[in-house]
């Protein structure tokens, strides 16, 4: 899994929260995002996508799966913002997704597994730092 971890780390996770756009990186603090989260009363966050399940390209089904994920988020009434995961090298298509706020991480993990995902990115308002949460143990 080292190559997959390297790919996650070589990605910028863009979050469009209201009028703000935040560029998040695995393992890197983001004081502006942390400050925004605290102003909104948000304590934790996670980025999830429905694209390319199992880390295999699936362009033809990505749009439909993203809509289905958005419906699941609405059913839970989770606060969220649009996100886009962009590989730094441009060697993987951008993946639309969502940054979900203050949801139970275990529930998000199960949701991501249901969409065939390998991992999600989670963090807290403490410093806005995102970390990879691998889902293969579920």
Can you name each region flagged by the protein language model?
Residues 94-97, 101-131:
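Short, compact, well-ordered microdomains
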Residues 25-30, 71-74, 82-85, 89, ...:
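Mature, function-bearing regions of proteins
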Residues 63-107:
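Amphipathic protein-protein interaction modules
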């Amino acid at each position: 899994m080292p190559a997959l971890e390297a790919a996650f780390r070589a990605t910028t996770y863009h979050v469009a929260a209201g009028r703000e756009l935040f560029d998040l990186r695995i393992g890197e603090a983001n004081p502006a995002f942390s400050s925004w989260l605290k102003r909104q009363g948000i304590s934790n966050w996670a980025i999830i996508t429905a694209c390319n399940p199992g880390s295999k390209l699936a362009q033809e089904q990505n749009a439909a799966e993203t809509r289905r994920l958005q419906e699941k988020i609405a059913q839970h009434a989770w606060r969220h913002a649009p996100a886009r995961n962009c590989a730094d090298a441009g060697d993987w298509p951008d993946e639309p997704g969502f940054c979900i706020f203050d949801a139970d991480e275990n529930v998000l993990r199960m949701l991501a597994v249901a969409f065939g995902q390998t991992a999600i990115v989670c963090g807290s308002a403490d410093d806005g730092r995102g970390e990879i949460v691998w889902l293969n143990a579920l």
